[in-house]
């Protein structure tokens, strides 16, 4: 990915991440995300292999997926940074987001599980990006 395009993608992602994190009401409580959430839950309820997915599982999956791009962007913009340092960034970003919700957004629900799921998503993103970089390097 060329750097200007990567910067644009990063900016778009950060807008989504910040908006999702500091929206005053639960992001799935109203609007398009509530419709998507309801439709996904209806779909999982009608699909025998997915009927175990309830709201809490869907929220956890969403938290993981939300932070996967962060891990990817960390590797794109800081490829030589040690993995442990990279992995700490999603944890710190999530702690900042969840802490802000606790302090300033009384209608939001911040939990340790959110931090864990967000961190997991970041680590998955780091793993994906590092794996792709390794494959590209080995193919040359």
Model regions and ranges:
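Bulky hydrophobic segments
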Residues: 1-108, 112, 126-140
């Amino acid at each position: 990915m060329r750097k200007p395009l990567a910067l644009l993608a990063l900016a778009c992602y950060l807008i989504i991440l910040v908006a999702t994190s500091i929206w005053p009401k639960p992001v799935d409580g109203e609007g398009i995300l509530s419709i998507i959430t309801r439709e996904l839950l209806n779909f999982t309820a009608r699909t025998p292999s997915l009927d175990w997915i309830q709201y809490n599982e869907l929220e956890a999956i969403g938290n993981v997926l939300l932070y996967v791009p962060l891990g990817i962007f960390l590797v794109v913009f800081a490829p030589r940074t040690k993995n442990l340092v990279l992995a700490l960034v999603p944890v710190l970003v999530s702690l900042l987001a969840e802490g802000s919700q606790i302090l300033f957004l009384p209608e939001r629900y911040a939990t340790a599980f959110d931090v864990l799921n967000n961190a997991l998503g970041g680590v998955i993103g780091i793993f994906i990006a590092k794996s792709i970089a390794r494959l590209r390097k080995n193919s040359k």
